[in-house]
């Protein structure tokens, strides 16, 4: 069963992801996914985090029709992707995926200079996603399971746009 889903996901990335731009960035969804996974591997993360890095934006490819983010709306692709993958993967994969958008909100709130390194497209999507967390939201967020891994995934996500 796992081999079937892996083949299905890789086909989705290759067939759909190679034809869809990653937001307003200069890479396709496929290029972005591969770059994220490569960064996780280069930094010696677990196979679960490498898998999460590869599949973290799969929700963008699961919409019927146009992804709402192209209209400046948050389509909650992270929830869609994590829910879809939860049948096949455990929380060590799906929780970082579900949290990677919120991690941008978290890092914008707690890390000086983080907002300034974001691309213009990422700054626009941050606003569509609710903007930076409050101090209280940030504290509550980071204490949940797998959030430290999710923050690392977010860092790969931010870098994988070349």
Residues covered by each model-derived region:
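Metal-dependent phosphohydrolase cores
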Residues: 1-162
């Amino acid at each position: 069963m796992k081999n079937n889903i892996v083949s299905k996901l890789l086909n989705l990335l290759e067939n759909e992801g190679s034809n869809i731009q990653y937001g307003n960035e200069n890479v396709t969804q496929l290029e972005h996914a591969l770059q994220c996974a490569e960064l996780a591997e280069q930094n010696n993360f677990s196979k679960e985090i490498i898998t999460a890095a590869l599949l973290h934006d799969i929700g963008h490819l699961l919409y019927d029709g146009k992804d709402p983010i192209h209209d400046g709306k948050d389509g909650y692709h992270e929830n869609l992707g994590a829910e879809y993958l939860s049948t096949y993967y455990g929380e060590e994969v799906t929780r970082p995926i579900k949290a990677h958008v919120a991690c941008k909100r978290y890092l914008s709130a707690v890390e000086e200079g983080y907002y300034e390194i974001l691309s213009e497209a990422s700054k626009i999507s941050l606003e569509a996603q609710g903007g930076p967390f409050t101090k209280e939201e940030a504290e509550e967020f980071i204490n949940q399971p797998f959030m430290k891994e999710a923050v690392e995934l977010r860092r790969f996500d931010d870098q994988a746009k070349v």
